[in-house]
Amino acid sequence: MNYKLNKSAAIISQTTNDYDHTVGYHDISPFNKNNDNILTMHRFPLKNTDLSNNIKAEICLWHSRESIIEKIDETDSWSWEQGSRLQWLNCEEIIYNIKKNKKNKSCIYNINNKQKKILESPIYSLSQKNKKFLYINYSRIRHFWKNYGYEFTDKIEFERQPANDGVYLSDFDNNQKLVLSIEKAIDICGLKKSNQYFFIAHPTFSPKGDKFVSLLRFINESGILISYFICTDLNKDTHTLLAREKVSHFEWVDNDTIVVWCRNLSPKYEKIRFNKYLEKYFVSSIKKILKLLKPGIQQKLISTHYHMIKLDNPYKLIKLNENNLTEDGHPQVSKNGRFLITDTYANKIGYQKLLLYDLIKNKTHFVGEFKVDSYLKNKNLKYDLHPRWNHNSNKISIDSSHDGSRQSYIIDIQELINTIS
């Protein structure tokens, strides 16, 4: 069996298997706010495993009830993990990244009148509240972290700690400004003495759009990704370091609360990661031993869990239900704020779990598990479920390869929610 579902959940729609179809990352809902039947979608040649942008991603609308996938454009600004950052701007318009004249830009497309508007900057995170968006240097991301950036044709020499690169804020009239430079982020994190090549990833607006969080990252001498989690208040022009060293996926619960998978250790441990000899001989040996243990035991030993961070007391990390949420995943909070949906990475036999966490009752419920197809595993390519809510908080969109190719699915969990509420 290549998948299993909770008896109170049901797959109600899936994309056609004549192409690969994928939504993208876990932080964007593909559902139209006024019509659950219309979802944003990327389309690729069937069983594509080429991570280069030589193959264009088709920008599509999935009319799920009618099983119709409508192509509206194509782009070569896409990544394996996140697509083109395709998302709804409002109920009539979508926005996605494109490349024009060798520069990364974004395009607004009106689904009613078919008109396009080209913006001078690419998009990462959108705030519908204040009609602004954040973006980053996708070429720098691609250079240091291949699965998340976009190909670039010109040879670029990157600085280690640039003052003129980082997170940018833009409106839809092309007014742009740098709101967090890589140099500033390095200073915030106390890393000015480091000689690493840094980059900033995942800048994400708070629900009200007055704050954003981002990850300052670098890859150390052992090939380990090191991360620092920063919150920027745009109104106050302040920055707060929230977590360090091991920080993975996160989600805003409300405008002042964040859930994040991270390690909660003292800064003393951080110094080990900057000592190349201790890192090479001590930490690497410990990691080999940990890999032999079950995920839950691993997390207890290395203090890595889902934590809640409240911005009014950011230095007190509140651990979530560790007995059931013992693995890193891709969380998204329901629109009504009651539930968190997340996944896990594939286990040793290739299955990824889909889990529903009740934020009020502090309890986790099994939704399903799905097997990564062998053609991806054989090429050492992961394909995450990246679960995403609809706007009524009763359906989930996932990407999965359990049927033999990359496809998207809609799972109705209303009955499951009714039984646990």
Residue spans for each PLM region:
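Asp-box/WD-like beta-propeller blade repeats and closely related beta-sheet repeat scaffolds
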Residues: 75-87, 91-166, 179-195
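Short, conserved, GDST-rich strand-edge loop motifs in beta-rich repeat architectures
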Residues: 41-55, 136-164, 214-225, 263-301, ...
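Blade-level signature of beta-propeller repeat domains, shared across WD40, Kelch, NHL, RCC1
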Residues: 383-421
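Blade-loop segments of beta-propeller domains
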Residues: 20-27, 45, 51-104, 374
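Surface-exposed loop and turn segments in beta-propeller and other repeat-based domains
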Residues: 12-21, 72-80, 176-196, 318-324, ...
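Blade-terminus and WD-like Trp-Asp/Gly-His loop motifs, strongest in beta-propeller folds
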Residues: 28-38, 78-101, 124-132, 136-137, ...
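Loop/turn-rich, solvent-exposed surfaces of beta-rich toroidal or solenoidal domains
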Residues: 291-306, 318-363
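Conserved blade-ending motifs and adjacent loop-strand segments that build the rim/top face
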Residues: 243-249, 318-332, 363-388
